Structure formats: structure tokens, C-alpha cells
Curated annotation (Swiss-Prot):
Zn(2+) 3 binds at residues 220, 231, 358. The lineage of its organism: Eukaryota, Metazoa, Chordata, Craniata, Vertebrata. This is Methionine aminopeptidase 1. It catalyses: Release of N-terminal amino acids, preferentially methionine, from peptides and arylamides. Zn(2+) 1 binds at residues 9, 14, 36, 40. The modification N-acetylalanine is found at residue 2. Zn(2+) 2 binds at residues 22, 25, 48, 52.
């Protein structure tokens, strides 16, 4: 606590002279908050800390209030590229959004190539980290916050809203929770979340295309807080969708949950792909092979590797204390994919739709804990859109 000129204590019911100011208020530039003692400061903390959140929100809004994009929208930025489906990018993208300096950042956040040196140091290893009780609490917190941010995005899904607007809201929601949006600058990814529409399998870059009636869109959120990452995604309906979209999204969610039901100590990671592919194929769908679930904790992506297709060669056996994601990508047509010239947007080669759901899971002694579960409902958002 820093000593300042005499003021009156801000604690309700206390009129003592106050010479102590909250250090966080000083850092954020909040004026007029003084306390007479550490006891009054601690006693007022539950209400006083709300000033910090308000100040951070206002600062973030000021930082983005002047952002504009001028000029016409370009829906064909890569001359000669043959798109696999009807979706087109809408360029130019908005400028990269800044993250305030008071937010803790992962090691890749300011790297010119977005490289994570901590991940690179462990590249190729199959050793799976057993999380300590402290690690687990860190993961529970960041996963709960990631869920809150995805729920913010879910409330925006409707025709006419752009994925750029969703990304903007996600960015601000991360900052309001003292979190860094993990995708931002990860190997130079330019946005704070991934938004994958229709034939986009994953890693779609938010842009100025308005969502259209009948679209399906996946929003993939990862937050970084206190040294830990929390990761989840859901696929949503945009307005009224056809029966094919409903079946695809429902089946994809069922694939995820059937795999989660199998998670417990002693199960081989390779077994999850058998479960997922069996259910997908039974419903006439295919499973993407190029992208997998992964270990996650202090590293965004690490061991284990968790393929979603059958007869895979994944290494490792589940143990209590492992944390990883399951995130099956299920397609209407073939599983083959290709990548747009932006280097990120993965699309189905045949242009047919793809859906995805993801949870971060903690293996427990008897099964698993879904760290990114909804706290207000056991249902994913799309079930409320029927």
C-alpha cells in the first residue's frame, strides 16, 4: 500500500482519516479510493474490486473505440484460388487488437513469428504431465472463464452478425476477466478466437462476412490466465437450418460425449478415435484426420496427441491428473481437407459442411471432470436453438 495525502476512508460506516491507497487503483489510474487500514481495505475488497473490473473494461473500450476499416470488401483476395465450397473470405481484416500491458501473456504473444519456445522445447515428446493440485485449480479457473467467454459469443449468434464482431466481443470479454486470448499471435494467428462457418473444419479467421440464415458456425475459445490455458468450442445454428445441419451437429456432439464417457484411468488414448468414428460412420458421416485433440495446461498444445479416427497410433494411457482436449471434427462428405492461402482456414476438400465440439477434461480416479462444462445447463447451446 502506498502512502498518500490524508483522505476519508471509503469503507461504509468508517469516517477515519485514510492515507493508504489500493496499489491496483494506482496502477489503473483510479482516483479517490483510500483506506484507513489494511483491515478496512480487506473488509471492503468484495465491492472495491468491482472498480478494478470497470476501469479495465473502460480502458479496453477506449483502445478499440477508434478502430475502423476503410474501403470496399474484397471477397477474392487470392487471385486464381479455387474454393472448395461457397464460403468466401471478406477482406481486409480489422487490425490486430491490442492486449493491455497488465494482462499476463504467454511466451509466444510478442514473438515475431508467434512461436512458443516452451512448446518447441518439448516438441516430439510423448511424456504426459501429471498435474499437481495447484495446477488443477489453475486449470479449473481458466476453463471456467473460457466457458463464460464462449457463452458471451453464443449470445451473439444470429443472421447479420459478422464473425469480426464476435471476435471483438470475445477479445473484450477476455480482457475483462484478466485473461489473454490464447489464439492471438499463436504462430501469427491474427485474431482472438476461431470462427468456422459451414465447410470450414477449424481455424477459421473472423472477418466481415455477415452470418447468414441457415449457416452453421463453430466458435473456438481459448483463454490464458495465471500461466494456464483453457480450451473449448461449440457449433451453433444461425437462424433456421436444414435437417442435414441438425443431424450433423447433433451427431458431432454425441461423438464428443460418447468419447468423454470412456475417459478414465487405464484407457488408451487411441481408443477414443474408435468410439468417435464408429458413431460418426453409423450416421453417414466421416471424421477429420488432420487435426487432433491435445494435452493442455501451461502449454497450449502438448502431449498427449488425441486423434479422433479409428485405428490410430496415439501413444499413452490415461492417468489421474492428465488434462487434455477431445474435439472431433465431423463431415457430411469426405474427411479430406485443404487449407486456404491464409495458412489457417481448413476446409473440406469436397466443400461439404463440417461441425465440431470440444471440451477440456481432467482425468480423475474414477472417470473425468469436464472442466469447460456449462454451469447453468448440461446442454450445449445448439439444443436450445431447436
Amino acid at each position: 500500500m502506498a502512502a498518500v495525502e490524508t483522505r476519508v476512508c471509503e469503507t461504509d460506516g468508517c469516517s477515519s482519516e485514510a492515507k493508504l491507497q489500493c496499489p491496483t487503483c494506482i496502477k489503473l489510474g483510479i482516483q479517490g479510493s483510500y483506506f484507513c487500514s489494511q483491515e478496512c481495505f480487506k473488509g471492503s475488497w468484495a465491492t472495491h474490486k468491482l472498480l478494478h473490473k470497470k476501469a479495465k473494461d473502460e480502458k479496453a473500450k477506449r483502445e478499440v473505440s477508434s478502430w475502423t476499416v476503410e474501403g470496399d470488401i474484397n471477397t477474392d483476395p487470392w487471385a486464381g484460388y479455387r474454393y472448395t465450397g461457397k464460403l468466401r473470405p471478406h477482406y481486409p481484416l480489422m487490425p490486430t487488437r491490442p492486449v493491455p500491458s497488465y494482462i499476463q501473456r504467454p511466451d509466444y504473444a510478442d514473438h515475431p513469428l508467434g512461436m512458443s519456445e516452451s512448446e518447441q522445447a518439448l516438441k516430439g515428446t510423448s511424456q504426459i504431465k501429471l498435474l499437481s493440485s495447484e495446477d488443477i485449480e489453475g486449470m479449473r479457473l481458466v476453463c471456467r472463464l473460457a466457458r463464460e467467454v464462449l457463452d458471451v459469443a453464443a449470445g451473439m449468434i444470429k443472421p447479420g452478425v459478422t464473425t469480426e464482431e464476435i471476435d471483438h466481443a470475445v477479445h473484450l470479454a477476455c480482457i475483462a476477466r484478466n485473461c489473454y486470448p490464447s489464439p492471438l499471435n499463436y504462430y501469427n494467428f491474427p485474431k482472438s478466437c476461431c470462427t468456422s462457418v459451414n465447410e470450414v473444419i477449424c481455424h477459421g479467421i473472423p472477418d466481415r462476412r455477415p452470418l447468414q440464415e441457415g449457416d452453421i458456425v463453430n466458435v473456438d475459445i481459448t483463454l490464458y490466465r495465471n500461466g494456464y490455458h483453457g480450451d473449448l468450442n461449440e457449433t451453433f445454428f444461425v437462424g433456421e437450418v436444414d435437417d442435414g445441419a441438425r443431424k450433423l451437429v447433433q451427431t458431432t456432439y454425441e461423438c464428443l460425449m460418447q468419447a468423454i464417457d470412456a475417459v478414465k484411468p487405464g484407457v488408451r488414448y487411441r481408443e477414443l478415435g474408435n468410439i468417435i468414428q464408429k458413431h460418426a460412420q453409423a450416421n453417414g458421416f466421416s471424421v477429420v484426420r488432420s487435426y487432433c485433440g491435445h494435452g493442455i495446461h501451461k502449454l497450449f498444445h502438448t502431449a498427449p496427441n488425441v486423434p479422433h479416427y479409428a485405428k490410430n497410433k496415439a501413444v499413452g494411457v490415461m492417468k489421474s491428473g492428465h488434462v487434455f482436449t477431445i474435439e472431433p471434427m465431423i463431415c457430411e462428405g469426405g474427411w479430406q481437407d485443404e487449407t486456404w492461402p491464409d495458412g489457417w482456414t481448413a476446409v473440406t476438400r469436397d466443400g461439404k459442411r463440417s461441425a465440431q465440439f470440444e471440451h477440456t477434461l481432467l482425468v480423475t480416479d474414477t472417470g473425468c471432470e469436464i472442466l469447460t462444462r456449462r454451469l447453468d445447463s448440461a446442454r450445449p447451446h445448439f439444443m436450445s436453438q431447436f
